[in-house]
UniProtKB/Swiss-Prot annotation:
Belongs to the cytochrome P450 family. It comes from the Eukaryota. Its cofactor is heme. Keywords: Heme, Iron, Lipid metabolism, Membrane, Metal-binding, Monooxygenase, Oxidoreductase. Gene3D superfamilies: Cytochrome P450 (1.10.630.10). CDD domains: CYP19A1 (cd20616). This is Aromatase. It is found in: Membrane. Its EC number is 1.14.14.14. One of its GO terms (biological process) is cellular response to gonadotropin stimulus. Its main location: membrane. It catalyses: testosterone + 3 reduced [NADPH--hemoprotein reductase] + 3 O2 = 17beta-estradiol + formate + 3 oxidized [NADPH--hemoprotein reductase] + 4 H2O + 4 H(+); androst-4-ene-3,17-dione + 3 reduced [NADPH--hemoprotein reductase] + 3 O2 = estrone + formate + 3 oxidized [NADPH--hemoprotein reductase] + 4 H2O + 4 H(+). It comes from Rattus norvegicus. GO terms for cellular component: axon terminus; dendritic spine; endoplasmic reticulum; membrane; neuronal cell body; synaptic vesicle; terminal bouton.
Amino acid sequence: MFLEMLNPMHYNVTIMVPETVPVSAMPLLLIMGLLLLIRNCESSSSIPGPGYCLGIGPLISHGRFLWMGIGSACNYYNKMYGEFMRVWISGEETLIISKSSSMVHVMKHSNYISRFGSKRGLQCIGMHENGIIFNNNPSLWRTVRPFFMKALTGPGLIRMVEVCVESIKQHLDRLGDVTDNSGYVDVVTLMRHIMLDTSNTLFLGIPLDESSIVKKIQGYFNAWQALLIKPNIFFKISWLYRKYERSVKDLKDEIEILVEKKRQKVSSAEKLEDCMDFATDLIFAERRGDLTKENVNQCILEMLIAAPDTMSVTLYVMLLLIAEYPEVETAILKEIHTVVGDRDIRIGDVQNLKVVENFINESLRYQPVVDLVMRRALEDDVIDGYPVKKGTNIILNIGRMHRLEYFPKPNEFTLENFEKNVPYRYFQPFGFGPRSCAGKYIAMVMMKVVLVTLLKRFHVKTLQKRCIENMPKNNDLSLHLDEDSPIVEIIFRHIFNTPFLQCLYISL
C-alpha cells in the first residue's frame, strides 16, 4: 500500500505545482508531500500502535522486544496504546491484547492454534514443527497432543499424587545434595529436582543424573528464550548463537541416550504392562510410522522440561508469598490439618483443599511465571471489530488482564480475590480452548501436593524481610527471578518444637 502511494503514477506531487513556482521551493513541496503520504499511511490502520515511518517503526518495536524482553515490552505497549494494539516483530504485524473479550475469542477458536517465532530460532532448539509447546504445524500438533493428554489426565494424574509425595520425602531426606558449605539449601534447585524426578518416574522411567540434567534444562531454556524472536541476521553470525547451540545439543544428546535406553527396555520387556507410559506410547507410534524418531525425542524432552522449568519457579514464588503473608500460611495450615491430618495427601483430598486452591490461584494471578501466550492467525478474522489478516501474530498479555478486570483488589495479594467464583473469561493462567496447556489439571494437583507436603513439615520465613515485589525479575518468554542477583534467603523452620533449623535460598 505504502509503495503504491509513492508511485508517481499514483500520487504525483509535481504535477500539482504551478509552472511559476520557483525551483528553490520544489524540495520543500516534495518534503511536505512525503510527510502527507506518511501520515495517510499511518492513519490507514484502525488499530492503535506506533507509526510505520518508512520502516523505522517496525525496527524500533522489534528492538524494544529484544531489549526489554517479550513480557516487559508487551506491558509497555499496552500501557502506551491500550489493551488492543499493534506492533511489529521481525517485520510481521503483531497484536498485543490484554482485553478479556478478545482473549476469549482467540483462545476458543481453532483459527489461532498455531504459534509464532523465529523459524531459525525454533529450528535451533528443535521446536520448529516438532513437539507440542511451540509446534506451529497444526497437523503434527494434532497428532502428538493426544499422547500428552493421555499421560497428563486420568490414571496418570491419580498416580502422580503418590509419586510426587514420595519424591518430596526422598529429596528432603537428601538436602545435602543441594546444600552449600554455609548450610543453605537452594530452594529452586530442590524444586527442580523434585519436578524432574516426578516427571521421569511418570513419563519415562529411566534412571538419570538429576543434577546434570537440571543444569542442562536451564541452558536449554535460556537458549529457547534468547532465540525465539531473534532476527534472521543474528543467525548469520555464528559466534553469536554458538553457545546456545551447544546448550541445546547438550540436553538433546542426553535425552536421546535416555530414550534409546527406553527403547531397549521396551524391546526386552517380558510384560509390556510393566513399562507402559508416555514414552512407550510414543515409541510404539514411531514403530507404526505415525511419528519420527525426532518427534519422539522432542516430545519426551518437552515433557521432562515443563515442570522443572516453570513450575519450580512458580512454587518458589508461592513460598515467598507464604513467608510474606503469615496469615495466609495460618489459614492453609488449618485447612491441611482438617482435610489431611497427619497422613500423606491423597487424590481424594485435592478437591477439598479450597483455601490451598484459592492461594494457588491468587499466586498465579498476582505474580504469574507464565503471563503471555503467543499465537498466529491461520485465516482472516475480526476480533472485537478489528480486522485481523491471515498470518498476523498475536500475543495475549494474560498477566496484565488479570490486574485490569473483575477482581476487587487487583493490585493486592489477597485471597479475597477468589472468595467468589471467578468467571473463566477473567482468569486464564493456563488458557482454555483447543490449544490450552495440556498439563493444566495435573499442574494444579501437583502444586497442591507439594505445598501440603512441605507445609506439614516446615514453617516458611524469609531473611531481611525480603518480598516478591522488590525482587529482581526478568519478564521475557516467562517471568523468572534474576538468578545472577545477590542471595535471597528463605528459612524453613521445622514445624515441631525441636531446635532443628533449616535455611533455604535461591542464588538470585
